[in-house]
Amino acid sequence: MKPSVILYKTLPDDLLQRLEEHFSVTQVKNLRPETVSQHAEAFAQAEGLLGSSEKVDAALLEKMPKLRATSTVSVGYDNFDVEALNARRVLLMHTPTVLTETVADTVMALVLSTARRVVEVAERVKAGEWTKSIGPDWFGSDVHHKTLGIVGMGRIGMALAQRAHFGFGMPILYNARRQHPQAEERFNARYCDLDTLLQEADFVCLILPLSEETHHLFGQAQFAKMKSSAIFINAGRGPVVDEQALIAALQAGEIHAAGLDVFEHEPLAKDSPLLTLPNVVALPHIGSATHETRYNMAACAVDNLIDALNGNVEKNCVNPQVK
């Protein structure tokens, strides 16, 4: 008899077929309490869980006494109560490698679009404001050979450094938990403390996961240390930044602009001051959102769940110690 799993995300037909070859699959729209109640028996019998973006906490785990593994279609897992998973010896699988290059592309797009004011200027053209040769009020800033500061030199940070160093001749500063010899050798990157990075970088790119340690790592004090000409990019997790402090820094001219793919609360509220600022490029958390990469992430998540329920946790497992 096949193990039972709950699927709370739509999959391409071929991936759903692959999942069904290995498991008895119950598809649900979400993991809200009313949904769990409607499918109580399926949740009670499920040994696996696959999806993304929904909260998986102790209350849900109480309804799933047979759960052995959960697989998220994402690299981030801050929506999972890892402590509760560990207590129940439930494996947590994620997709850390397949989205690296695509997210780095998005970060570089934010660097370019903020510096060159691409979104703002394009909207002015659409509004009919281009009636003569443009003047300085349409100009942006150079990207090439400017100093890029990367906070978080993981896979995505490395991919960003590659683009910036080889493509744009940008000197690289970085701050991370530990020095990264490969980054220093390949990109001539310079390790420095956060204050030094903030003071020297023309672009500050934040690529950090959310944790107790990183929550509101960036606030008023950090923005005050940046150059007034500096551009801030966040493509990690929204709550790593005190959003009100960011808004205040932008409004006061303490920093020049911001490119944001993540926010403290998502979706971003329609009345957010960020949406009124012309020097802000706001994206709807599209870091990995290409057809190709989202397919590859889903395929990886399916394979991860198959591996986990077969006792294979050699890759992509957050908590292999609970096996």
From Swiss-Prot:
Its EC number is 1.1.1.79, 1.1.1.81. One of its GO terms (molecular function) is hydroxypyruvate reductase (NADH) activity. It is found in: Cytoplasm. Keywords: Cytoplasm, NAD, NADP, Oxidoreductase. Pfam families: 2-Hacid_dh, 2-Hacid_dh_C. One of its GO terms (cellular component) is cytosol. Belongs to the D-isomer specific 2-hydroxyacid dehydrogenase family. GhrB subfamily. NCBIfam families: PRK15409.1 (NF011938). Homodimer. This is Glyoxylate/hydroxypyruvate reductase B. It comes from Klebsiella pneumoniae (strain 342).
